[in-house]
A protein has these predicted regions:
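Periplasmic polypeptide-binding modules associated with outer-membrane biogenesis and secretion
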Residues: 20-231, 261-269, 415, 434-437
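Repeated loop/turn-to-beta-strand initiation elements of outer-membrane beta-barrel proteins
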Residues: 196, 221-223, 250-256, 281-287, ...
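Residues that define the transmembrane beta-barrel architecture of outer-membrane proteins
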Residues: 207, 236-240, 267-271, 309-313, ...
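Transmembrane beta-strand segments that form the barrel wall of outer-membrane beta-barrel proteins
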Residues: 221-231, 242, 253-264, 271-273, ...
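Membrane-embedded beta-strand positions of outer-membrane beta-barrel proteins
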Residues: 223-225, 244, 256-260, 286-290, ...
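Outer-membrane beta-barrel proteins
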Residues: 231, 245-250, 274-281, 316-324, ...
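Transmembrane beta-strand segments of outer-membrane beta-barrel domains in Gram-negative
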Residues: 278, 285-432, 436-438, 442
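C-terminal transmembrane beta-barrel domains of outer membrane proteins
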Residues: 398-561
Length: 561
């Protein structure tokens, strides 16, 4: 199968017209950095099954009780501490002051259990002990579901001390709530190097429940190899990339990722190293990354003798405010520094810039049962930064500050909102929606703009067909999951960008509007092999240069392990 993938990619290499034609404006380091950024994460999927309380036998009516009824004037409770007796009596108002049968009393007990579950105490159970009814008061015994022991079974690459650090945050000997348990199990499953499934078992002490985690180790090394025609003719239309992950090599739940990518013409190459380390047992994570990108332009821009590079250092810290199966709310604060250099030997020109920035990202996602169920994700990023030029050669800075120049130097701020929705229609059919909005307070460098065109945004257009300081991108799709291994989608996209926040001229059009429509297909081929294909037709504005009388094709083949 791997050789089939190689052969298919070789076919792509013989068909460069299917990939894209070069835009009129030559790409620079900033725009190529945009081109290499990974696509936005999709809406969430459930990562663990629902956590359910162990099944308990239903109570049986005493022999000879028949249709006997008792006049109930009130209820008393034993064993409750998490919820007061007064609160529980309010939950049983409908059963008070009535003549109740045994079945009615069981319903009252179930109402008490429902009140506990509403508060998150999913292990709570109510019982009807032998009664000595006085003045019509019924006694209900409550087992609130105290946590007994926590145990690990199986093996993981993650140290048991690290895993127990998360389990030790559970309130041993106290009533256990579903949100607390669910959060810790999900956080454990985010650790690189292992997976864990939960089993709840009756504890040795009456009314207690033991938490047992069955662990399975992940491979030390995982990765993905991908071949695609996602590139640009000026730097190489066909790409090959490799990502390698070291999963918990130090048994701390950390992940270290090394990545490399190059094109068939070697006009573009990128390489990077990224690390992610959990800190403590509350969900804190620190990240650090170093990446580099080198390019040289060919094709229609070969006469420019242009080349350059981007070097990026990034560090961040993240924390999940809410972590559950149904909804999540996370914060991520990142600081970065980017050095961008563009060289043009044809004019003996060099542009040397540095951008330092700080970004706060708030991410929220949720699963719901609305009209058959669906998932929603939203990411709001607030970024503030500063662009400086290397003033050892002031020519680039002076050109930037001309009245007709881009005027990007100095401080800037921008806000980006990305929202997605996946709506289930039937088991096989779903609707997908996506919107990306960006606003800023000044003219931005090409690396900070909203860019349209390419397989991730508007596949009917070439990479970097249009970019602007502010704008909107809307994507709609209907997806049909024909079988577990194959899905096909029909989509339409629309994008509009304002080229400059503060244009140098008011007589020149300061925006571009693009639209496209097409069809895509995704395959899972055997174990680890994937393939995707996109055919898209440009719509509202023709591509630059125009060739909108035929579709643009994008193909990707991958193997993960």
């Amino acid at each position: 199968m791997f050789f089939v993938a190689i052969a298919a990619c070789a076919f792509v290499q013989t068909q460069p017209v299917f990939a894209q034609t070069a835009p009129q404006v030559p790409p620079n380091a900033g725009r190529l950095l945009q081109e290499l950024r990974p696509p936005v994460a999709p809406p969430p999927e459930v990562t663990i099954p629902p956590i359910l309380a162990p099944a308990e036998p239903k109570p049986v009516a005493p022999a000879g009780s028949g249709d006997a009824r008792v006049n109930v004037t009130g209820f008393d409770f034993t064993g409750n501490s998490a919820i007061s007796s007064d609160e529980l009596r309010k939950a049983l108002a409908a059963w008070t002051g009535r003549a109740l049968s045994f079945g009615d009393l069981i319903e009252a007990v179930e109402a008490v259990e429902a009140r506990y579950k509403q508060a998150g105490y999913f292990l709570a159970q109510g019982v009807l002990p032998p009664q000595k009814i006085k003045d019509g008061v019924i006694e209900i015994g409550i087992s609130e579901g105290r946590l007994g022991e926590t145990r690990l079974e199986g093996e993981s690459r993650v140290s048991s001390d690290v895993v127990f650090g998360y389990l030790d945050r559970l309130p041993k000997g106290q009533a256990l709530t579903l949100p607390v348990l669910e959060r810790q199990v999900l956080l454990i499953n985010e650790l690189a190097g292992g997976r864990a499934s939960l089993d709840l078992q009756a504890g040795e002490e009456a009314g207690s429940t033991d938490v047992v985690l069955a662990q399975q180790p992940e491979e030390l090394i995982s990765g993905r190899l991908e071949l695609s025609n996602y590139g640009s003719p000026s730097t190489g239309g066909n790409r090959i990339s490799l990502n390698l992950n070291a999963n918990s090599a130090f048994h701390l739940g950390e992940r270290i990722t090394a990545s490399v990518m190059t094109t068939d013409t070697q006009g573009l190459a990128s390489y990077g190293l990224r690390g992610e380390l959990p800190v403590g047992s509350e969900g804190w994570r620190i990240t650090a990354a170093a990446t580099g990108t080198d390019y040289s332009l060919g094709g229609a821009f070969a006469n420019l003798l242009a080349s350059g590079f981007v070097n990026t250092l990034r560090a961040g810290v993240g924390y999940p405010l809410i972590r559950s199966r149904a909804s999540n709310l996370k914060l991520l604060l990142e600081a970065d520094t980017n050095k961008l250099v563009d060289k043009y030997k044809s004019t003996n020109t060099q542009i040397d810039k540095r951008i330092r920035g700080l970004t706060l990202t708030v991410s929220a996602d949720a699963l719901d049962e609305f009209f058959g169920g669906g998932s929603t994700r939203a990411d709001l990023a607030l970024r503030s930064g500063n662009l400086t030029f290397d003033l050892t050669d002031p020519g680039a800075f002076n050109a930037d500050q001309l009245p007709a120049g881009p005027r990007t130097a100095g401080g800037f701020s921008k806000a980006t909102l990305i929202a997605q929705r996946q709506q289930t229609v039937t088991r096989e059919l779903s609707l997908q929606g996506f919107i990306n909005l960006q606003a800023t307070n000044k003219n931005l460098d090409s690396s900070e703009k909203l860019t349209l065109g390419g397989p991730a945004t508007l596949p009917g257009y070439a990479n970097g067909e249009a970019s602007g300081d502010e704008g909107v991108l809307v994507k709609l799709a209907v997806r049909w999951q024909a079988m577990a291994e194959f899905a096909v989608s029909v989509f339409a996209d629309y994008g509009r960008v304002q080229l400059a926040h503060s244009p140098a001229s008011t007589t020149v059009k300061n925006y571009r509007r693009l639209s496209d429509a097409g069809v895509s297909a995704d395959w899972v081929i055997g174990k680890g092999f994937t393939a995707s294909a996109i055919a898209a037709w440009a719509g509202q504005e023709p591509p630059n240069p125009a060739d909108n009388d035929r579709p643009r094709f994008w193909v990707s083949l991958g193997y993960g392990w």
